[in-house]
């Protein structure tokens, strides 16, 4: 069905030509819209400081939700923060690297910059590529992403293709490896000429099960003298909404996989470099190249993923797959209180109170803003159920979500004495002011989707009276802000529990509290009704 498709635009290097971009997008939107979003690959800002400043300050408005990558030239790095940010209501900087799960169901991977060893925001290296792949290694049955956005081209992209680019383009070997693992259905890149490669296969004919094909589209820069194409429109049906037969249908002009020879050569060289002095491979090593990567979603034991780009020294990244995916074999399932169709409730590690729960998505989704409507609806059902449970105990429910330096949707739900409710709003706003940012009160008819774009960090708290406090000013945002406010003297008076690591319980105690939570929640547990249907 057409409604299952996302209608998107993608453009090449803008290079500061904002007026021309907006004019073209406005015309295209009127003639062929509405479009869900515009993605810009390549260099976005230009040399006109005045225009750049107007865009950053929101004085130049974009007609549809627009998402941009980071710099590919170090001269523009100063214009970008370290984390993703919403420059204006319709302009979002995605960050250096990450995954964007859209409300329409698309999974979009992105990596900014050029391959290099510099630590500047304009460069990426092997560690960046590995970190981007980490959350995908935990997805059971992972078969690919819908879209991959990169600033530059992958190396050897034109190999085995009948049509060739008008000019040879330098490519990144690391991006070739990334594309081989991600298997995107569409791969858009900038910093080059216009080139729509014939689709390539992601499997070996007769040797491997059929997989979907990949379409690589290189886009030229706005205002290029050759007047090459710099804007591309397409309808993309999310992979997760497609039957296997539809997904793996092979176009008649599909070519062989372009990166095989390159990656086999690299793998062979890496194996040789690991050999010891007598020409033998080190014990336990094995030479193997798999085009598909971890098809069954086995964990790879690498560092945890962070969507926001640089986040301090890399050796400080937590190790392992996503802690909150139920499909993760290492998930602490003894903490689970109830499991719905799209979400589940669990007691967090180091709870603030004995009835502190969090509601998380069953699938790997980053935030409420990027969640499909059925996930958001089930979060509300859990919220209503835990509110009833709190009322029965003479308590009130406070909820908050921090979509900042997190990789999995989690809404914290904490019960407090009703007598403490009056101090909540002032406690939140005072703590925010002390931390250097402002919490705004959302209007009664405003939703999170009205306040922030997908992929942008934010914090939101909902008070027992239904009012919501919100910020997207995340510079210097305290990671324990929500817990800090609730643990303060006027509310729960347990300031020793601000950091969850300082109050982790023994497993036996966790099991005891979870069993009590299940018992208390049972009269309000709508998931039990779902199971009986």
UniProtKB/Swiss-Prot annotation:
GO BP, one annotated term: mRNA splicing, via spliceosome
Region (Disordered): 290-314
One Gene Ontology cellular component: post-mRNA release spliceosomal complex
CDD domains: MPP_CWF19_N
UniProt-recorded Gene Ontology molecular function terms: RNA lariat debranching enzyme activator activity
Pfam families with a match to the protein in the record: CwfJ_C_1, CwfJ_C_2
Family to which the UniProt record says this protein belongs: Belongs to the CWF19 family.
Protein name: CWF19-like protein 1 homolog
Organism for this UniProt entry: Caenorhabditis elegans
